[in-house]
């Protein structure tokens, strides 16, 4: 779980636009966040396997 202070800091508008970064909506993780879902890879995999994300299916080929 991310620190609450870091989550609050990320929500503020930065002085320079290039300093803005995404965080996971569920756990607050700053790395490997998928923009389409707003979730990190860990939460995306967990919620996807539980069937909580409509239209998301596990790939097999």
UniProtKB/Swiss-Prot annotation:
HAMAP family: Ribosomal_uS14_2_B (MF_01364_B). Belongs to the universal ribosomal protein uS14 family. Zinc-binding uS14 subfamily. It comes from the Bacteria. Pfam families: Ribosomal_S14. Binds 16S rRNA, required for the assembly of 30S particles and may also be responsible for determining the conformation of the 16S rRNA at the A site. Transmembrane segments: none annotated. The lineage of its organism: Bacteria, Pseudomonadati, Campylobacterota, Epsilonproteobacteria, Campylobacterales. The gene is rpsZ. GO terms for biological process: translation. This is Small ribosomal subunit protein uS14.
